[in-house]
Amino acid sequence: MDITRRKLIGYLLSGAALSVSPFATHAADALLVPFGTLPSPQKAHRVLSAGAPADLLLLALAPEMLLGLSSFDFSVSGSEFLSDTIRKLPKLGRLSGRASTLSLEKIVSLAPDIIIDCGSADETFRSLAQRTAAQTGVPYVLVDGKLRDSASQLRQVGALLGVSSRAEKQARLAERFLQDAEHFSRMSGNSPRFYSARGATGLETGLQGSLHTEAAEQLGLINVVSEPSQHGLAQVSFEQLLLWEPDIILTQDANTYRYITQNALWKNLQAVRKGQVLCYSGLPFGWLDSPPGINRLLGMRRLQAHFDSKIQANWMDDLQQFFRLFYHSDLNQTQLQRLLEAG
């Protein structure tokens, strides 16, 4: 038996498996839900990300503490817009989401001081966090990842990791974007009705109130796909789309955009015929949706700029500032032009 497996079994048999922290019994709307005894900010030097939204939060706040990324492999592509520190991070696999690819043995061998996840904080993810902390002996923090709470997420996780100064600068930019979005939502009058298109044929979508459509909904745009008892993703039929007749169609996938704009069936929708299909593919991560992390601040800002000339006038400066603060990268003119074309 190798030492990693022996150590893991030791946790489970000796009673060293962590009990739930008292903080974990907080109300369901708590922003940070910890499991286990958290390290002090001065001792949290090795941080493990549990999923893609946490990757984005942590590479913004503390890339030097990250052991690696859960979902992105920058040795393949997408790293030219990021700092050297981020570019060198390995892909380790993910804990949360569909089909975990990171084993408990691997977690123990990495010896993190803390595991952080961000996104949905429902009972499924709380159960995973509690179980992982108990089985590995590593404290785990679940961050409720709603877009409107981005500034608070940055401040609270920044304080947890001892990087409050950096977090405050990021939080202030997030607050400015969100406050402008809130003002726009109140002043826009008849809000456009939108459909968020995902997948090869555009018939996967985010339900109203889901993490996947917050960037548009934060601006007051109305999601045509609403199911009060459900959140998350759903498959719809084209017949349903014809009944909904959205004013605009949003996507962040260039292949989805091409399919929608070139397929004869989709031309039955007024939004397609009128050229109201907006594609914000973004780089190096999706801007509107995937992953549903703080990267969506950019998608929200870009979408507001489409409707608001005052925001459009400063879009280039906002884009540069976001990359400087969140991705620790000063864009050159070539990179900036590529981003403007992608968004």
Give the positions of each predicted feature.
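A ligand-binding cleft/hinge motif common to bilobed small-molecule-binding domains
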Residues: D122-A133, T251-K267
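C-terminal segment of N-terminal export signals and the immediately downstream linker at the start
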Residues: M1-D2, P22-P39, V47
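Solvent-exposed loop/turn segments at secondary-structure junctions
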Residues: P53-L56, F72-S75, S120-E123, K146-S150, ...
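Ligand-binding pocket segment of bilobal, Venus flytrap-like solute-binding proteins
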Residues: V225, G232-T256
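N-terminal export signals
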Residues: K7-A28
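A short, structured surface patch at a secondary-structure boundary
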Residues: A54-S109, I114-E123, L221-V224
